[in-house]
């Protein structure tokens, strides 16, 4: 009998991907549109990384790779996690995946049985709940509040823990809020994972895009309970190369590799050699990251100053490249607000699928000129131009 599975029918397409695709299509049709939708850097991949890919091609490094990644990259990852995150891991405790998204997908497939609960802090990246449900898990939302800077309250998290809790997902710096969780908060959450014996899934994909404070990896507190997920996409402007990576307990990493072996086989071999260059040519990569970070900082400040001048509220982000903007001055809800802004020539992502109701997400991974245009169009929507 033909038909789609119930689990696929229950899965929602990614809202952020859909909105960005719509914005790109409108642009292709000639619509004058400022898109503040992209969850990716607007910079090109650094030249030293592209050159490494060309070398790999010239050297014929085009065959299958092992499911967990080429050994050279796993060794570099173990060193990266030690050097930058303070995590004592071996190459066997690392894995390379087809983007950070696959690392998370494989992880939930590896650890969840039907009915297992996963605590997800809201607002959240749109894919966390869908991945959990697809693996048979149950999503338990714990709210973070704008008046608290969208930083989680460990006691609120504690109250959500049950005997069925299998994991807690944390994402700092955060998408969509830009919040950076203080060290003491992450330490408290890590201690909860140890106390109640569940996994702490730490998504650190934006670790290098930090404007205030310091990045802290909770795996330093609870190494046997923590899976640290990261990737090349955001730091090195490599979104299309599709290289993610993770580290954690060896038995979980091995299970994640088994999922890869029966699905994608392995990440792109050439992209792995390029990522190896990004991780090991530290001087060139550091210069690129610092350049990008300072550009994002300027853009963030420009956008926040403009929103404030228009009377629009947003919690100041300390990391990533997103702002959650309160939509109450524009429309009764975030969906209608996004529609009004689109009519004015600005594409944004409604907060609905982030569980950020009454807000839209603005990405400042675009030029300062585009941000100024967007602010001018916001002013027209508000009747102030």
From Swiss-Prot:
One of the protein's GO biological processes: biosynthetic process
Family annotation (CDD domains): AAT_like
Main location: cytoplasm
EC numbers: 2.6.1.1, 2.6.1.78
GO MF assignments: aspartate-prephenate aminotransferase activity; L-aspartate:2-oxoglutarate aminotransferase activity; pyridoxal phosphate binding
Cofactor: pyridoxal 5'-phosphate
Subcellular localization: Cytoplasm
Annotated Pfam families: Aminotran_1_2
Site (Important for prephenate aminotransferase activity): 12
Catalytic activity: L-aspartate + 2-oxoglutarate = oxaloacetate + L-glutamate; L-arogenate + oxaloacetate = prephenate + L-aspartate
Cellular component annotations (GO), alphabetically ordered: cytoplasm
Chain positions found as N6-(pyridoxal phosphate)lysine: 234
Keyword terms, alphabetized: Aminotransferase, Cytoplasm, Pyridoxal phosphate, Transferase
Principal EC category: transferase
UniProt binding sites for L-aspartate: 39, 125, 175, 361
Role this protein plays: Catalyzes the reversible conversion of aspartate and 2-oxoglutarate to glutamate and oxaloacetate. Can also transaminate prephenate in the presence of aspartate.
Quaternary structure and partners: Homodimer.
Family per similarity comment: Belongs to the class-I pyridoxal-phosphate-dependent aminotransferase family.
Name of protein: Aspartate/prephenate aminotransferase
